[in-house]
A protein has these predicted regions:
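Short, Lys/Arg-rich, polar N-terminal cytosolic tail immediately upstream
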Residues: 1-5
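Terminal, non-globular segments
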Residues: 7-468
Length: 470
């Protein structure tokens, strides 16, 4: 009874801490292009979201659920970020309870301690994108796969299928991760428990059938990626090393990759020696997902970046939690625990710092300076990204950019540069790269001044207001 009370106190204490943390991170106002895209998508109807998303490179479930969640709040940025935090909170609450039941309270509590602080997932904890939802889908798929293996109950199969579909409809590399989980469960059934083959086949068929409505869009998106230039850079040995370092420490302290890497190898040896199948199979999911992404990128076309592995983060932390909970030596256990918690907590400072407004960040005050402009002309190198951020702060003034999203655009006021016609305009706001004057070839007879230099997510830009003089 005393142990149960201690577990309950720790469980709810961690949940309170995590809830406060996610609510705090959701206060961030530092928006980047992909988040602006999400916010522009929400006012559209569900049918329009399906159509627009089909022309993009992601499935639609995140936008549907985000629209429903934020509807009472007027599609606010805070509500959208909070939706991501809620998904992470569910992972934490369900994971802590179920992992404690299945693998012992020590494993469950370590999962709860480490997952909110894991920098790779923490960096996306309140991001207005689909990574939190896809993480939830992959985690549910894996959790119910294990429950199916133990108990073979119908509702566990339903949970397994629901998790797989949530992953598949949220992000394509979450789909890959779910496919790996389905495949690993099949292999285990063939080797050790053939009575599970029939329900596996039935619920796999159900999964495929329920994915059929999106399958045509998925195939068309794959064909587009295969036949057109895409923004993802080729993977090299150097970039792969950088990606792995980023996975280990995100944007935090440099010592973290060494600490976490060495501990990970130690846990791998320990769990392999004890033949602990569940955490080893859990680790196989991100490893195989990463390997497939790198292989396709190397052989066909670059399609993978390291943040696409975020949906597998709960499984990585489950592996770590299993490893540390099996350390027998009290001295070694204490040292390992201190290293992990210190390293993770140190990175927490960087995540919290990110919610602070960027110095000279482009925001509504910047667009207010140019409120007399009849149009924005984007002449920055990253015109596709900058135009989306500008549209978030001013969704009424026409914005013209060299690169646009075409049919995949949810923005009401972004147009291709070919449609720019300044003949009837008296004032135009021009955005250029920092320290770069406007190109006046498209604005004959215009002169003006620079209003300021701003940080628009990853780009430093100059904002100019030009007025017709002739």
């Amino acid at each position: 009874m005393l142990k149960q009370k201690r577990f309950s106190a720790a469980y709810y204490g961690i949940l309170i801490f995590a809830g406060a943390l996610y609510a705090l991170l959701a206060l961030s106002r530092n928006i980047w292009a992909d988040e602006a895209y999400t916010l522009a998508m929400l006012p559209h109807s569900f049918g329009e979201i399906w159509r627009i998303t089909a022309a993009d490179v992601h499935p639609p479930l995140y936008y549907f659920l985000a629209k429903l969640f934020t509807l009472p709040f007027g599609y606010s940025q805070y509500a959208l970020r909070l939706f991501s935090g809620v998904c992470y909170f569910v992972i934490l609450a369900l994971g802590g309870r179920e992992l404690s039941r299945l693998f012992g309270t020590k494993t469950g509590l370590w999962f709860m301690v480490l997952y909110p602080l894991f920098p790779f997932s923490l960096e996306h904890a309140a991001e207005a994108r689909m990574y939190a939802l896809s993480s939830l889908g992959v985690f549910l798929c894996a959790l119910f796969a294990y429950r199916v293996w133990l108990e073979n109950k119908v509702w566990d199969w339903v949970g397994f299928t629901a998790g797989g579909l949530c992953a598949a409809y949220s992000h394509y590399f979450a789909l890959v991760a779910a496919g790996v989980i389905y495949g690993l469960l099949l292999v285990c059934c063939l080797l050790r428990r053939r009575k599970l083959l029939k329900p596996w086949l039935i619920f796999s068929a159900v999964t495929i059938a329920l994915y059929l409505p999106w399958l045509k869009c998925f195939i068309e998106q794959l064909a587009f990626k295969a036949n057109n230039e895409y923004w993802i850079a080729p993977i090299t040995l150097g970039s792969l090393v950088e990606d792995l370092l980023y996975l280990l420490h995100a944007n935090g302290t440099g010592i973290f990759p060494l600490v976490f890497g060495l501990l990970g190898l130690g846990f791998l040896f320990l769990l392999a020696r004890e033949k602990a199948a569940a955490p080893l199979l859990a680790l196989a999911v991100p490893v195989l997902t990463l390997a497939l992404g790198v292989l396709i990128s190397a052989l066909l076309r670059p399609i993978f970046i390291i943040r696409y592995l975020v949906p597998c983060a709960p499984l990585i932390i489950f592996f770590v939690a299993c490893g540390i909970s099996r350390v027998q030596s009290k001295t070694l256990y204490g040292a390992t625990a201190a290293l992990l918690v210190t390293a993770f907590a140190g990175n927490l400072l960087f995540a919290v710092e990110d919610i602070l407004p960027s110095p000279n960040g482009f925001n509504a005050a910047a667009t207010a300076q140019a409120d007399s402009a009849q149009a924005y002309l984007i002449q920055a190198g990253s015109d596709l990204h900058v135009s989306q951020i500008v549209s978030y702060y001013d969704d009424e003034t026409p914005i013209y950019a060299g690169e646009t999203l075409g049919a995949a655009s949810p923005y009401p006021n972004i147009y291709p540069l070919s449609e720019f016609s300044p003949e009837e305009m008296q004032r135009v706001a021009v955005i250029t790269d920092a320290l770069t004057p406007p190109d006046l070839s498209l604005l004959p007879g215009f002169q003006g001044e620079k209003l300021g230099t701003y940080q628009a997510a990853f780009d430093t830009i100059d904002l100019w207001l030009l007025e017709r003089t002739k």
